[in-house]
């Protein structure tokens, strides 16, 4: 709570992407984060569901998006390739841009970019590698 309030005060124009996994407990935690963002007047850009698939199920992101009255930006599948690329320090979107997971992540990023408020401060980060 205190950290979130401090961040909102330090970054009053920040925009929030709420990330959850399909499980109900994760949705509850992410819901509290989203409500904290709203209570501190931070704009919620949308919700991302992570680790979607056979192991954890799906639908938690959509339920949370509805609860927070925010768009569902996308559902990222539980993909071993995503972990493997993270372990070697090369983003999946760079190493395997044609993979389903990479395309979903790029789609989420493009949606976030398109939804930015006018006057948002954007700083490009170079890809290392």
Identify the meaning behind each predicted range.
Residues 1, 5, 99-102, 106:
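Alpha-helical membrane and juxtamembrane elements of multi-pass inner-membrane transport
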Residues 1-88:
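Conserved catalytic-core segment of NTP-binding enzymes
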Residues 71, 85, 99-100, 111:
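Residue-level detector of solvent-exposed, low-hydrophobicity positions
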Residues 88-103:
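C-terminal boundary of histidine-terminating zinc-finger modules
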Residues 104-111, 120-129:
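A short, charged, Gly/Pro-tolerant segment at domain boundaries
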Residues 114-115:
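Generic C-terminus detector
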């Amino acid at each position: 709570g205190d950290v979130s309030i401090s961040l909102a005060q330090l970054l009053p124009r920040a925009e929030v992407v709420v990330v959850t996994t399909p499980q109900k407990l994760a949705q509850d935690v992410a819901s509290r984060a989203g409500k904290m963002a709203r209570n501190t007047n931070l704009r919620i850009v949308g919700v991302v569901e992570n680790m979607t698939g056979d192991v954890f199920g799906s639908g938690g992101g959509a339920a949370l998006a509805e609860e927070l009255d925010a768009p569902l930006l996308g559902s990222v599948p539980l993909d071993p390739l995503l972990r493997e690329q993270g372990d070697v320090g090369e983003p999946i979107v760079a190493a395997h841009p044609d993979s389903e997971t990479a395309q979903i992540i790029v789609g989420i990023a493009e949606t976030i970019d398109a939804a930015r408020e006018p006057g948002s401060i954007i700083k490009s980060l170079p890809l290392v590698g």
